[in-house]
C-alpha cells in the first residue's frame, strides 16, 4: 500500500479550472492495438494521442470557474439540481442470476423520446401516457422508479434482445444507480452517435430495486457482471462488448477484469475515479476532515438505508451465527440483525458499516483487512483487456496518492491522470462532464478503428 499524502484534499496546488491530462505509461510501453483499415499497429497511448484528442497526453480542458477545487466539484455534483440535464429514458429489465438473486438492467431507449413527445428545450414529455405505461408494467410490491424510467413490456424486451449493435455496460458507484447525473451523462454521450446499445447494470438493491436473496454486494461481487456479459455474448456472439465502471463500480469492474484475464468477452474497458487501493481510500476518508465530514457519512447512511429497506429478505434474528465458516467465495450474511440495524443508523463512515456487515460476511477479522484484500490494485497485473483509466489528483474520495508504479507495469492500461475534476464530476460551466464525453469518445474511436 502507498503512504497517505500529507497534503489535504484541498490545497493551493490543486485550485483552478484549467485541467490537464497526463499519461502514465511504464518503461515497457503500451500494448499494440491492431487497426482495421490499414492493418497498422499502434501503441495504446499513441492511439489516444492520435485518435482521441480529448485524452491526448497534455490535452487541456476547462471546468467551471466556480467549482475550482475537487471538493466543490464533488459537492456540487451531489447537491445541485440536475433534473433537467441528461434527460435519458430507461427501460428496466429484472435480471435473474444462477444463485436465485436479481438485479436490474436499465436500457437506454432513445426512441421513447419520440414515443412520449419529448421536448428537448423544456425536457417536458407526455407524462400521462408514460405513467399509464409505467403503471401497466410495474411489478407488484416493487419500489417506485426514478423519472423517465419504467419496466419493459415483454415485446419491448424481445425487441431489445434483437439489437446487435456493440453494447456498452455501465457500472455505477457505491451510493448510486442509473438515475445519477453522471451516469445519465455517460449514457447520453455514449448513445449520441447511434453506434452503441447502452445499458446500466444496477447492483443488487440499488436504484430502487429489491434484494431477493440474503446477499449484498461487495468489492468482490463480480459474479453478476460475469453472468450478464456471458448472457449478452451468447445472444450475439459476433458483436463487441464494452464496459465502464464509475467509483466503486470501477473497483468491481477492475476486479472482474483481473479475475477473468484472457477469458473476458470485453473488447475494451474504462474506469473513472476508481479507488484502486481501498485501504488507502479508507484512511483518506477518516483522516482528511473534508472527506470525512462531507462524504463518508452520507455514503454510510445510504448503505444503511439499503439494508433497512431490504430487511424483509436480509433480516435474521438477533444473536444469529454463521451456518458455515464465511469466505469470499462462500459468504455468510448472518449480520443483518435488528440490533445491528439500530447501530448502523448512527454510523458516520463506510468503515463502520464494513466493520459490522461486509468484513464478517466474507470471513475477514475487520474492515481494514477486507479493504486490503479486496482492492483492485491486487489484480491489475492480470488485466488482459485494453483499459482506459481516468483518475484525478484532487479527488476527495480517492485522494491524490494513486498507485502509478503498479498500474503502469501493465501495458494494457492507459492511465490518464488529471490534475482537476474531483470525484466523478469534471463539470464545466454548463454542468456538462468532461470525463463522460472523453470516455464516450474513447469507446467510439476504439470501436470504429480497432480490430
From Swiss-Prot:
Keyword Transcription regulation assigned: no
Cellular component aspect of the GO annotation: lipid droplet; mitochondrial outer membrane; mitochondrion
Cross-link position per record: Glycyl lysine isopeptide (Lys-Gly) (interchain with G-Cter in ubiquitin): 114
Main function: Displays enzymatic activity both for medium-chain fatty acid (MCFA) ethyl ester synthesis and hydrolysis (esterase activity). MCFA are toxic for yeast and this enzyme could thus be involved in their detoxification by esterification.
Protein species of origin: Saccharomyces cerevisiae (strain ATCC 204508 / S288c)
GO MF term set: acetylesterase activity; alcohol O-acetyltransferase activity; monoacylglycerol lipase activity; serine hydrolase activity; short-chain carboxylesterase activity
E.C. number(s) listed in UniProt: 2.3.1.84, 3.1.1.-
Keyword annotations: Acyltransferase, Hydrolase, Isopeptide bond, Serine esterase, Transferase, Ubl conjugation
Keyword Nuclease attributed: no
Protein name, UniProt field: Medium-chain fatty acid ethyl ester synthase/esterase 2
Comment field (misc): Present with 2550 molecules/cell in log phase SD medium.
Domain of life: Eukaryota
Catalysed reaction equations from the record: an aliphatic alcohol + acetyl-CoA = an acetyl ester + CoA
Annotated family: Belongs to the AB hydrolase superfamily. AB hydrolase 4 family.
Listed InterPro entries: AB_hydrolase_1 (IPR000073), AB_hydrolase_4_CS (IPR000952), AB_hydrolase_4_sf (IPR050960), AB_hydrolase_fold (IPR029058), ABHD4 (IPR012020)
Domain AB hydrolase-1: 166-430
Amino acid at each position: 500500500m502507498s503512504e497517505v499524502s500529507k497534503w489535504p484534499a484541498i490545497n493551493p496546488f490543486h485550485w483552478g479550472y484549467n485541467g490537464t491530462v497526463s499519461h502514465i505509461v511504464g518503461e515497457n510501453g503500451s500494448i499494440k492495438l491492431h487497426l482495421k483499415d490499414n492493418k497498422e499497429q499502434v501503441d495504446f497511448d499513441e492511439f489516444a494521442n492520435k485518435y482521441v484528442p480529448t485524452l491526448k497526453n497534455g490535452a487541456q480542458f476547462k471546468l467551471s470557474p466556480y467549482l475550482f477545487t475537487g471538493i466543490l466539484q464533488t459537492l456540487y455534483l451531489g447537491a445541485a439540481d440536475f433534473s433537467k440535464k441528461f434527460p435519458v429514458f430507461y427501460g428496466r429489465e429484472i435480471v435473474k442470476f444462477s444463485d436465485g438473486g436479481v438485479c436490474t438492467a436499465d436500457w437506454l431507449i432513445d426512441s421513447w423520446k419520440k414515443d412520449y413527445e419529448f421536448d428537448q428545450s423544456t425536457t417536458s414529455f407526455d407524462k400521462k401516457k408514460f405513467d399509464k405505461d409505467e403503471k401497466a408494467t410495474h411489478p407488484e410490491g416493487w419500489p417506485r422508479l426514478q423519472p423517465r424510467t419504467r419496466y419493459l413490456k415483454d415485446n419491448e424486451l424481445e425487441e431489445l434482445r434483437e439489437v446487435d449493435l456493440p453494447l456498452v455496460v455501465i457500472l455505477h458507484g457505491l451510493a448510486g444507480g442509473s438515475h445519477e447525473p453522471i451516469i445519465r451523462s455517460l449514457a447520453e454521450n455514449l448513445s449520441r452517435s447511434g453506434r452503441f446499445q447502452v445499458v446500466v447494470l444496477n447492483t443488487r438493491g440499488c436504484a430502487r430495486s429489491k434484494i431477493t436473496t440474503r446477499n449484498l454486494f461487495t468489492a468482490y461481487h463480480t459474479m453478476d457482471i460475469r453472468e450478464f456479459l456471458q448472457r449478452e455474448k451468447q445472444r450475439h456472439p459476433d458483436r463487441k462488448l464494452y464496459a465502464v465502471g464509475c467509483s466503486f463500480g470501477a473497483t468491481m469492474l477492475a476486479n472482474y477484469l483481473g479475475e477473468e484475464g484472457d477469458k473476458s468477452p470485453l473488447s475494451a474497458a474504462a474506469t473513472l475515479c476508481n479507488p484502486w487501493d481501498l485501504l488507502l481510500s479508507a484512511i483518506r476518508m477518516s483522516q482528511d476532515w473534508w472527506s470525512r465530514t462531507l462524504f463518508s457519512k452520507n455514503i454510510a447512511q445510504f448503505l444503511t438505508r439499503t439494508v433497512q429497506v431490504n430487511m424483509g429478505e436480509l433480516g435474521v434474528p438477533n444473536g444469529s451465527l454463521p451456518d458455515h465458516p464465511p469466505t469470499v467465495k462462500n459468504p455468510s450474511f448472518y449480520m443483518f440483525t435488528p440490533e445491528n440495524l439500530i447501530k448502523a443508523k448512527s454510523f458516520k463512515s463506510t468503515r463502520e458499516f464494513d466493520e459490522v456487515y461486509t468484513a464478517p460476511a466474507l470471513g475477514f477479522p475487520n474492515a481494514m483487512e477486507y479493504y486490503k484484500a479486496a482492492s483492485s490494485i491486487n489484480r491489475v497485473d492480470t488485466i488482459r483487456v485494453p483499459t482506459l483509466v481516468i483518475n484525478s489528483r484532487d479527488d476527495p474520495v480517492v485522494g491524490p496518492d494513486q498507485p502509478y508504479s503498479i498500474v503502469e507495469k501493465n501495458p494494457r492500461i492507459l492511465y490518464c491522470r488529471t490534475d482537476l475534476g474531483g470525484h466523478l464530476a469534471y463539470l464545466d460551466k454548463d454542468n456538462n462532464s468532461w470525463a463522460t464525453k472523453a470516455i464516450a469518445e474513447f469507446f467510439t474511436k476504439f470501436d470504429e478503428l480497432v480490430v
